[in-house]
């Protein structure tokens, strides 16, 4: 995460500052330790060099910084200054696929490295790991055949065929085997009364079952999956007396009996352990008088039964972890809900182990195995074997998106074919007695490994030319070595010219750094002008004036330098992975990694191996709890968009695998999976409603159940729209006509009423119609004068 980069820069500056303090502080550490030999000089600090040139001026210190020695005219070929280095001895390229010749498959590179380290120095080297595609897989199914698993036995009778069908999608080279266990066939674990119960433990239940057995190997790993089905069908259950089973005995024998089981060297090894009960552990055998500790060896007899079941105790978790690691076996606990928390605790102590919740009848075991294999293949975790006590290692992981995560030696959320790298710093404390040693770094469950050969460069080349009884050392009172005299016992001085028996008080002023200060810091005797430091039960006193020791550093919780460093003249020199004045602050970050793959859940900073939550409202060991933070629906929505629909900000930033570690399963509809389930709904960019459920089971496995088809609004029906438009136009036209007719009618009625009103008010005079003409007309002749 980008928020960690300032922390990395600060750590780098602190380291550089510490180194600078050694060189340019108030005093030069190389000249203040009072060393008088080349070997002692190299042990003071990685920055110190020794000059064996006899022509070096007498007042010039031979143990000094290299640049100072050159200034003092020391010839370059006479300067002893070994430099720590790393050399790659073998580095085969990483393979891309696992098919073909398995001997040529390489998942770890380089394979061999040689380190040369001088005292208290360190060197960084790199390691790359790739989960190759189509890698061979061996699956050994180890089943509890106690009476309570009777229904489970019938459920797995066709498991071989189904498992092969599913696993063929992941590998073309699969082999499967079968074994069974109950418990030690001895009282008090078995029924011994009535006598018939010995041969038939189900006698009191009016039923028949097999005599009790510890562990039996049934089917050697084979690619003939039908044989698995046939052998399972032949099996019958037995019955034990107490609740815990003897499963750890079976795990141990299935792990160490390579030839019987048929584990291949070049394959992934999966040991599937199924049970519905607790299991006995080391020292439980004493209940039956069995006191002989488990020896971690194969004891399967000719009858394929565990022959030491009644004579050897159950194995311890530590022994089991050691053997599983040696044989590169990944253990899968497929257990029922009632004991899942117990086996979850076991898995935290056994690297490379996963836990799945088994249904009461084992009907889900197929999906459980496939999911567990996917989880195993999605993680790379380094383990270290045979590390010398004087060496300490610190890791930085580069997982996805080339992001460096300090203090981490594992990567999760990977896909098959992904390549991850680790930067490893090896630091030596002091100078080990055994000058050449080796150790191994390997990913858990991988056969491939990196072998690191270490040579501790504690000696000087000039020591090979030492001259015992040299005349230069006062006529043979010492050995002339690397330009100085190494005096024999009883002689002191630069040329071994002074006998310890010659005591002159006038020389005591040379044993005090300043006038008035104690002689030899009151921790030594001044002989011949030199301090001979006292021996101490607490440690070693050194220095020109006996001013230094390796036991006067600060203590934290009762341990010097917190038990994570060495005391060097009052200062703690911390081991790798530790820092601070007390060396009480770890630089590892794996303890801060949350289940979602983020440091402190992305809500805090990792300081000294603990999360300091900075987002308001967040709390928990990894800041995983935050009631006021955006809820799970808001956080998981981006993962659904990325993994299901291949879009969203996580997809654009290529961070899908990094932030989304949950399994996604597509369903037709959401069901009630219990109180640990959260139903979520959101509307996507297409305006569709997406429904999903976030569920985390008791084993810690998180699943996103996503409804396959989002609920999107339906598109418009063209015919309906067309008819609707036409109908609307027709209705509008009819409405317009009706309104127009109504208005006309209203208007006519108003006019008629007005006419009637005016007619009623009108008053007419009687007169002839001026237009009316009678039918006859009378004319008078004005010229007629008759009578």
UniProtKB/Swiss-Prot annotation:
**Phosphotyrosine modification, residue list:** 772, 784
Membrane topology (UniProt)? Single-pass type I membrane protein
Q: Which UniProt keywords apply?
A: Calcium, Cell adhesion, Cell junction, Cell membrane, Cell projection, Disulfide bond, EGF-like domain, Glycoprotein, Integrin, Magnesium, Membrane, Metal-binding, Phosphoprotein, Postsynaptic cell membrane, Repeat, Signal, Synapse, Transmembrane, Transmembrane helix
Q: Which residues are glycosylated?
A: 345, 396, 477, 584, 679
**Record keyword Repeat present:** yes
- Any GO molecular function: protein kinase C binding
Q: Pinpoint the VWFA domain residues.
A: 134-376
Membrane spanning residue stretches = 718-738
Q: Which cysteines are joined by disulfide bonds?
A: 30-48, 38-460, 41-63, 51-74, 202-209, 257-298, 399-411, 431-458, 462-482, 473-485, 487-496, 498-528, 511-526, 520-531, 533-546, 548-569, 553-567, 561-572, 574-583, 585-608, 592-606, 600-611, 613-623, 626-629, 633-680, 639-660, 642-656, 688-712
Q: Name one GO biological process term.
A: regulation of extracellular matrix organization
Compartment(s) of residence: Cell membrane; Cell projection, Lamellipodium membrane; Cell junction, Focal adhesion; Postsynaptic cell membrane
Segments in the Extracellular topological domain: 27-717
PROSITE patterns xref list: EGF_1, EGF_2, I_EGF_1, I_EGF_2
- Assembly notes: Heterodimer of an alpha and a beta subunit. Beta-3 (ITGB3) associates with either alpha-IIB (ITGA2B) or alpha-V (ITGAV). Interacts with FLNB and COMP. Interacts with PDIA6 following platelet stimulation. Interacts with SYK; upon activation by ITGB3 promotes platelet adhesion. Interacts with MYO10. Interacts with DAB2. Interacts with FERMT2. Integrin ITGAV:ITGB3 interacts with FBLN5 (via N-terminus). Interacts with EMP2; regulates the levels of the heterodimer ITGA5:ITGB3 integrin expression on the plasma membrane. ITGAV:ITGB3 interacts with CCN3.
Described by its record, this protein's role is as follows: Integrin alpha-V/beta-3 (ITGAV:ITGB3) is a receptor for cytotactin, fibronectin, laminin, matrix metalloproteinase-2, osteopontin, osteomodulin, prothrombin, thrombospondin, vitronectin and von Willebrand factor. Integrin alpha-IIB/beta-3 (ITGA2B:ITGB3) is a receptor for fibronectin, fibrinogen, plasminogen, prothrombin, thrombospondin and vitronectin. Integrins alpha-IIB/beta-3 and alpha-V/beta-3 recognize the sequence R-G-D in a wide array of ligands. Integrin alpha-IIB/beta-3 recognizes the sequence H-H-L-G-G-G-A-K-Q-A-G-D-V in fibrinogen gamma chain.
* Protein name, UniProt field: Integrin beta-3
Native source organism of the sequence:
Rattus norvegicus (Rat)
Q: Which gene encodes it?
A: Itgb3
